[in-house]
């Protein structure tokens, strides 16, 4: 019944989009006489090496927006509305649609001038713009042909700095600026970047009142050539009440005051405030230190906001401080820094009920969380989470109990600094780091077995904001899995029966100890490029200890510590995401996800929770979670095999075209490809082992459409995927369902929170 309903929903959506598309084709019938609908704007260039599309922002009139860069559905929706705005349907169609854009000759002329000036600013001083139109019925195509010509280049770049102190500060850095040893195009952007570079250097060297407006240029071009001689001038300091220009004043920090933001006071240790404050008496004023101080306090959970004000100290105070620091006036002036801190409530309690549905088994869960944001008066974040869950399991026969119960407790303690005996104070102040200790204990009681899991971890997280990098180091991370009871029925059916022997299955229901460490690095630049790599290993330290201490071994020949076999493996994960933005409404997201894990030494099989799975809302979306792979393997009777459909290697390739529809709704069209494989040959995973000669043929492919409800702070995602190539079948109609689609067999619906990548 559910499949049938989804089929009708699919048909309804198809005809809805088809109707709106047809409506968009007839929008010109509402164009007034003497006017033209601006159907398309095209930017061209007569120079092959000049990208005309980069200047699209200077065109004042844009055509109506398109879904997926092709379909003018918003315009078609607006055109479906009648003129009677008293009717609800007409107002609704106009609100979610888009008004037609009519060609305006004045806006076209102004756009030509804006485009010419933009090319001038890029160094094309002889640029021209040719404008033409093509009319078809009541629709008009506007064509802007850019003729940039040859760019002007900087032949000679000199500095005119009359302040000798500033000149000496800048001299070692001149090679980082506009250097005529390398060719530089004569662009406004290059000249402005040089102003910003110099301003930043001086702002970090005590020049508190300096800004880039004190820098200007003069340029001289030689007649008949495209070479330009440029001189940078740095003017003297001038105030409103001082007619005569003077040397730029240089400021030092004379005094720092910490001011609580409310009457209750901020209960932070002095050492914590000092470690996070880079503004100190006796140091030059530095804009970078100011921003770092803001960033440091923003990381402290005990502080709600920070406000830092500077005021120039009176002359008599400056004289006194000069004597203390052995400086002579008027070489320096002094600033008094007032740092106002306002703290948050230290204690919070949260309760979160949940409803669960695991393969049709209904249940409920509840989470109670307590947080203290200032445990030791150092803005340490302590949290303890209590979780309880209950689920009624259907379809089990031969078991005395049919309920699943879980109780867990997890405690975390975060320190907003790098806690290590080897780190320097300066590194701790600038590293933007967090150290975290976590301990957890989980009780799981199922009809088939009881499981107890103890975990403990110590990790560091720090970032380099300027380079858009984030690092995480886990040393160590401990997991102890204990199976106090396994049902005799479960043993007989799955673990002891010769016909069902499975190394992966047995290994998953044995006591296990994992001692691992890991390191990851993530790069994220302006939401356009994201790269993440992680490597982790387990059991190596224990293996070295075993070579000396000679641990006892179990029946499978595995070394044991505390009478439990330990896991040993190496794992590497890598992901890359690239977002190509065509316009404010349309973008293309490309994603690659690769992972490999190799068990060795004391382990023949990877721990179950470390194995890869395929399918689901964040993988190949034509399949449900765990429904795909490994390789060409397919579950018994076409059913999902929870244990066997896991692997040691994964590869996912995805492309998703994203478009804004209307209001909070976004749409997507996607193509996914990928699978998982095992590195070793297992009897119960036929066709699952990775080989270079077969893996391309075993890549699953799916396609589909998605609808997203974007509330900015979270996104609800609905994806409908269809199988295109199914590696579980080597040939025939089932191998290429894209040619012979069957909705009840090939369709998969996903609901998730957040984007897939």
Task: Give short role names for the model-derived ranges.
Residues 204, 331, 348, 399-595:
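Transmembrane beta-strand segments of outer-membrane beta-barrel domains in Gram-negative
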Residues 235, 280, 311-313, 342, ...:
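Outer-membrane beta-barrel pore domains and translocons
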Residues 242-428, 508-515, 523, 527, ...:
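Outer-membrane beta-barrel initiation region
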């Amino acid at each position: 019944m559910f499949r049938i309903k989804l089929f009708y929903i699919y048909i309804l959506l198809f005809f809805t989009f088809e109707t709106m598309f047809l409506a968009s084709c007839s929008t010109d019938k509402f164009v007034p006489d003497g006017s033209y609908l601006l159907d398309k704007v095209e930017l061209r260039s007569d120079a092959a090496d000049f990208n005309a599309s980069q200047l699209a922002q200077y065109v004042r009139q844009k055509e109506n927006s398109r879904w997926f860069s092709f379909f003018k559905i918003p315009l078609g929706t607006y055109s479906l509305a009648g003129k009677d705005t008293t009717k609800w349907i007409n107002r609704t169609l106009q609100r979610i649609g888009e008004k037609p854009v009519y060609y305006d000759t004045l806006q076209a002329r102004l756009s030509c001038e804006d485009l010419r000036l933009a090319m001038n600013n890029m160094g094309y001083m002889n640029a021209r713009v040719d404008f033409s139109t093509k009319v078809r019925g009541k629709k008009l195509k506007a064509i802007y042909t850019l003729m940039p010509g040859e760019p002007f280049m900087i032949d000679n770049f000199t500095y005119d700095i009359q302040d000798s102190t500033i000149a000496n500060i800048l001299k070692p850095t001149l090679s980082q600026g506009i250097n005529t040893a390398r060719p530089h195009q004569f662009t406004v952007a290059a000249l402005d970047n040089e102003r910003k570079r110099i301003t930043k250097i001086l702002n970090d060297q005590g020049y508190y009142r300096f800004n880039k407006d004190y820098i200007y240029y003069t340029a001289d071009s030689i007649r008949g050539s495209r070479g330009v001689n440029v001189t940078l001038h740095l003017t003297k300091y001038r105030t409103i009440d001082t007619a005569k220009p003077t040397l730029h004043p240089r400021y030092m920090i004379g005094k720092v005051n910490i001011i609580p933001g409310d009457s209750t006071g901020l209960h932070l240790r002095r050492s914590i405030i000092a470690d996070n404050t880079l503004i100190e008496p006796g140091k030059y004023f530095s804009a970078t230190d100011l921003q770092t101080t803001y960033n440091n306090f923003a990381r402290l959970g005990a502080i709600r906001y920070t406000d830092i004000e500077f005021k120039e100290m009176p002359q008599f105070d400056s004289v006194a401080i000069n004597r203390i620091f052995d400086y002579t006036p008027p070489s320096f002036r002094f600033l008094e820094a007032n740092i106002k801190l306002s703290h948050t409530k230290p204690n919070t309690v949260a309760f979160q009920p949940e409803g669960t549905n695991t393969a049709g088994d209904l249940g409920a869960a509840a989470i109670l969380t307590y947080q203290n944001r200032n445990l030791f008066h150092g803005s340490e974040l302590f949290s303890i989470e209590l979780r309880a869950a209950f689920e009624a399991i259907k379809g089990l026969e031969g078991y005395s109990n049919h309920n699943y119960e879980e109780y867990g407790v997890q405690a975390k303690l975060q320190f907003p600094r790098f806690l290590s005996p080897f780190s320097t104070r300066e590194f701790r102040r600038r590293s933007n780091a967090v150290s975290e200790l976590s301990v957890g204990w989980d009780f799981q009681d199922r009809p088939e077995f009881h499981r107890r899991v103890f975990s403990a971890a110590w990790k560091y997280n720090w970032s380099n904001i300027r380079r858009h990098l984030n690092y995480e180091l886990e040393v160590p991370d401990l997991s102890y899995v204990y199976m106090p009871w396994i049902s005799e029925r479960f043993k007989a059916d799955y673990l002891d029966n010769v016909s069902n022997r499975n190394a992966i299955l047995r290994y998953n229901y044995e006591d296990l100890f994992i001692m691992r460490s890991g390191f990851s690095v993530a790069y994220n630049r302006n939401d356009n490029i994201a790269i993440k790599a992680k490597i982790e290993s387990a059991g190596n330290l224990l293996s070295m200890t075993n070579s000396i201490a000679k641990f006892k071994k179990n029946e499978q020949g595995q070394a044991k510590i505390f009478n439990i076999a330990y896991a040993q493996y190496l794992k590497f994960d890598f992901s890359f995401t690239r977002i190509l933005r065509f316009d404010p409404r349309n973008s293309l997201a490309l994603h690659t996800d690769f992972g490999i894990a190799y068990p060795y030494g004391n382990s023949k099989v990877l721990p179950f929770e470390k194995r890869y799975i395929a399918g689901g809302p964040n993988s190949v979306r034509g399949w449900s979670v765990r429904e795909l792979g490994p390789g060409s393997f397919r579950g018994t009777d076409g059913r999902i095999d929870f244990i066997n459909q896991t692997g040691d290697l994964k590869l996912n390739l995805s492309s998703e075209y994203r478009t804004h529809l209307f209001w909070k709704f976004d749409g997507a069209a996607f193509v996914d490809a990928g699978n998982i494989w095992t590195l070793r040959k297992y009897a119960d995973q036929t066709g699952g082992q990775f080989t270079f000669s077969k893996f391309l043929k075993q890549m699953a492919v799916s396609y589909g459409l998605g609808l997203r409800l974007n509330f900015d702070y979270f996104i609800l995602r609905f994806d409908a995927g269809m199988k295109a190539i199914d590696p579980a079948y080597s040939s025939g109609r089932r191998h290429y369902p894209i040619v012979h689609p069957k909705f009840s067999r090939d369709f998969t619906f996903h609901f998730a929170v957040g984007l897939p990548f």
